[in-house]
Amino acid sequence: MIGFEIFLAIGMFTAIVLGLVAIILVARAKLVSSGDVTIQINGEHSLTVPAGGKLLQTLATNNVFLSSACGGGGTCAQCKCVVVEGGGEMLPTEESHFTRRQAKEGWRLSCQTPVKQDMQIRVPEEVFGVKKWECTVESNPNVATFIKELTLRLPDGESVDFRAGGYVQLECPPHVVEYKDFDIQPEYRGDWDKFNMWRYVSKVDETVIRAYSMANYPEEQGVVKFNIRIASPPPGSDLPPGQMSSWVFNLKPGDKVTVYGPFGEFFAKDTEAEMVFIGGGAGMAPMRSHIFDQLRRLKSNRKISFWYGARSLREAFYTEEYDQLQAENPNFQWHLALSDPQPEDNWTGLTGFIHNVLFENYLKDHPAPEDCEFYMCGPPMMNAAVIKMLTDLGVERENILLDDFGG
């Protein structure tokens, strides 16, 4: 009798285990996609791809590159597309990025959308003009204490067909980078020593993608140029250093960098309105692209001014280029303001934060600031202060154009 009970118990246990295995297999078949699916794009292009990944990465694998400044983290909301069919329900991570109307129209973040079944999607047509290059580092010097000017040489015969104010994405591989190995010119090492920046180490286990505005303008061909600020941890924090910027700061001439692009929406309006450019820090990049494009390529007669804020003269760069542009173009003026000029600067020019300088020295006496177009790129606090000042002056939001790299 005891032996029978033992066999019965073993049999029941085995049956339960087999039943659970069957349930798991059925659930897996329903929840985990496998095999190939078809993605129809804009009703014209068709891809046959393996199921199971996210839409953003699946498209990129097939050379269809949607913009993604956060590299697929679901925070930048640049990888938007319309999912006409397939893709399942919108995820909670997507909801804050869309209005109810957009949600009903099928807008999704491609980085959050699973590829589980046949799909129909719509993307901007310009996506099909996006290309991928393996570029070579031509130079990577400091132009300010915490900003590098990275210049990449494109492969022979290649060019980036971009508009001024556009950007590309850089791909950073897994790496271990030690700040003590950075090549920082002697004139910029003081603050690196002061804040003991050399102690940081960047460890990255997977590929990272980030977006950067180009500092060159369309006629500067064969290269792409960037102004990239190191994203070091705030003092006293346990946060890791910036993944992409740490890798960029360690790049040397001859190194290879993968680039995708071009992308963009921070473009100049085709009008005759006065243009006022406002920049700070690494926000110099799209300012340079726009201003050089207007004056060198388009030979614009529009009234143009550029207001740039820096801490001290050591943090100001491209000054000789802007001096030359001002000398060559009577319709262009530029103004540098220092918020913390050093004794060695012997500075007699404008001082203070750039939004106050712009208001006190120009806009408060301007007959019609609401008729100007304002283009800006800089640290988030600068952007917020400038936007408030312009709004208080009656400038409509449609005439305030922002390259919001600061989030």
From Swiss-Prot:
Transmembrane segments: 6-26
Cofactor note: Binds 1 [2Fe-2S] cluster.
Superkingdom, natural source: Bacteria
Cofactor: [2Fe-2S] cluster; FAD
Localization of this protein: Cell inner membrane
Annotated GO biological process: sodium ion transport
Keyword annotations from UniProtKB, A to Z: 2Fe-2S, Cell inner membrane, Cell membrane, FAD, Flavoprotein, Ion transport, Iron, Iron-sulfur, Membrane, Metal-binding, NAD, Sodium, Sodium transport, Translocase, Transmembrane, Transmembrane helix, Transport, Ubiquinone
Binding site for [2Fe-2S] cluster: 70, 76, 79, 111
Keyword Flavoprotein included in the entry's annotation: yes
InterPro entries per the UniProt record, alphabetical: 2Fe-2S_ferredoxin-like_sf, 2Fe-2S_ferredoxin-type, Beta-grasp_dom_sf, Cbr1-like_FAD-bd_dom, FAD-bd_FR_type, FNR_nucleotide-bd, NqrF, OxRdtase_FAD/NAD-bd
E.C. numbers: 7.2.1.1
A Pfam family hit: NAD_binding_1
One GO CC annotation: plasma membrane
Molecular functions per Gene Ontology: 2 iron, 2 sulfur cluster binding; electron transfer activity; metal ion binding; oxidoreductase activity, acting on NAD(P)H, quinone or similar compound as acceptor
The protein's enzyme class: translocase
Start and end residues of each FAD-binding FR-type domain: 130-269
Reactions catalysed, as given in the entry: a ubiquinone + n Na(+)(in) + NADH + H(+) = a ubiquinol + n Na(+)(out) + NAD(+)
Ranges for domain 2Fe-2S ferredoxin-type: 35-127
Subunit structure: Composed of six subunits; NqrA, NqrB, NqrC, NqrD, NqrE and NqrF.
Similarity-based family: Belongs to the NqrF family.
HAMAP family: NqrF (MF_00430)
Protein name: Na(+)-translocating NADH-quinone reductase subunit F
Annotated source species: Pseudomonas aeruginosa (strain UCBPP-PA14)
Classification lineage: Bacteria, Pseudomonadati, Pseudomonadota, Gammaproteobacteria, Pseudomonadales
Gene name of the record: nqrF
